[in-house]
Amino acid sequence: MVDIAATLIHWYAENKRELPWRETTDPYRIWISEIILQQTRVVQGLEYFNRFMLRFPDVRALAEAPGDEVMKYWQGLGYYSRARNLHAAAKEIVEKFGGEFPRNYSDVLTLKGIGEYTAAAICSFAWKLPYAVVDGNVYRVLARIFGIDTRSEEHTSELQSRLHL
């Protein structure tokens, strides 16, 4: 039988792109990258990420910035509710968590604009907590590996239970 994990790890080692959010365990930088990359190609997102980090290097800088300035730095990315949610969540982090990004999944999930995927990404990549970061592409690959038809809710639930999600 083919060792799928070893095959994927080898492929990644040969083909990975060097991206700043892969070289950090800073939950703020991971969060910003995850939100920017929603509905955005990596090439375009990288430019916005770098510019955003220069202006808003940490959660306090983002929380304290005027809303119109946050929107200015987001201009051109579209889906402007993402920027409004980032700004609101940054304020929540400062007010409710003393400016420290929450370290547990359920607290991360309470932040405005953060769903299960983004919460899992932050907790997994920043703190190595055991949360599966599963998007549509991962579902498709795993469904093929397990021979599961994901067109129905029942089969999608089967895949989720195999992944312990």
What are these regions (language model features)?
Residues 158-165:
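Short "domain-exit" segments at the C-terminal end of structured domains
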